[in-house]
UniProtKB/Swiss-Prot annotation:
This is Formamidopyrimidine-DNA glycosylase. Its EC number is 3.2.2.23, 4.2.99.18. GO terms for biological process: base-excision repair. DNA binds at H93, R112. A zinc finger (FPG-type) spans 240-274. Coiled coil: none annotated. Its cofactor is Zn(2+). The active site is at P2, E3, K60, R264. GO terms for molecular function: 8-oxo-7,8-dihydroguanine DNA N-glycosylase activity; class I DNA-(apurinic or apyrimidinic site) endonuclease activity; damaged DNA binding; zinc ion binding. The lineage of its organism: Bacteria, Bacillati, Bacillota, Bacilli, Bacillales.
């Protein structure tokens, strides 16, 4: 699933490709992707004649701002936005096509069909689901070690499960939580309330630095991720633990292990990340 670094790189490349283009028509071939309004035909009619003004990101969501509305899109596991010419073949996994007046088309492709789109009037998007209950952005001033400490000390859930909760902070998924906890030297099954202030400080620092580095490297291409210009990321080359079960730890040489935490495959070093 694309996490913050991947979605941010999609946002940047997509904004360069489609800002200023006017939507002539919308073709939806898999209506279940459109969650709001509940009729894809209405979604289509509302967007006709709208011009894309800018594209923002909130957590793992893309926000496409048009003249009067905002399309809130979640890519889920395999979603991709790619620009095409009108005479190019249409991939069988293309489920939404935004046809522009200049003859180009923005295709939303999704092999798994798990992605979603919500359409809101401008100004309504942040106060309604799916954005309303999201936590702070990792790079915002609102996220501090103190913010994390106040919330982590109130829960006995395992720290990996807590960091995956987008209500605490946004953007971390399975890949980057494993990497953050390795850099923090915290076992993924530690109870959040057991963490010291110094350990929480390490988690905060690792979150900001890991995500920042991943954004600069274009994200991580583990399976099929590409940005909207068709480019893969390169941060996968710097991963320390994710997907590396059975390999030696880069720090101590111990063989990395994999377990399941909160239903998610979890990679860690049993020496560098002791379960206290």
């Amino acid at each position: 699933m694309p996490e913050l670094p991947e979605v941010e790189n999609v946002r940047r490349t997509l904004e360069n490709l489609v800002t200023g283009k006017t939507i002539e028509d919308v073709i939806v071939t898999y209506p279940k992707i459109v969650k709001r309004p509940d009729d894809a035909k209405i979604f289509k009619e509302m967007l006709k004649g709208e011009t894309i003004e800018n594209i923002k990101r909130r957590g793992k969501f893309l926000l496409l701002y048009v003249t009067n509305y905002v399309i809130v899109s979640h890519l889920r596991m395999e979603g991709k936005f790619l620009l095409h010419q009108e005479d190019e073949p249409i991939d069988k996994h293309t489920h939404v096509r935004f046809l522009f007046t200049d003859g180009t088309e923005l295709h939303y492709k999704d092999v798994r069909k798990f992605g979603t789109m919500h359409l809101f009037k401008k100004g309504e998007e942040m106060n309604q689901m799916p954005l309303a209950d999201l936590g702070p952005e990792p790079f915002d001033a609102e996220l501090t070690p103190q913010y994390l400490q106040e919330r982590l000390q109130k829960t006995n859930r395992k720290i990996k499960v807590v960091l995956l909760d987008q209500r605490l902070l946004v953007g971390l998924g399975n890949i980057y939580v494993d990497e953050v906890l390795f850099r923090s030297q915290i076992h993924p099954e530690r109870e959040a309330s057991s963490l010291t202030a110094e350990e929480i400080e390490r988690i905060y620092e690792a979150t900001v630095t890991t995500l920042g580095e991943a954004v600069k490297r274009g994200g991580s291409t583990i399976r099929t991720y590409i940005n909207s210009q068709g480019q893969i990321g390169s941060f996968q080359e710097l991963l320390n633990v994710y997907g590396k079960k059975g390999e030696p730890c880069v720090t101590c040489g111990t063989i990395l292990e994999k377990t399941v935490v909160g239903g998610r495959g979890t990679h860690y070093c049993p020496i560098c990340q002791p379960r206290i």
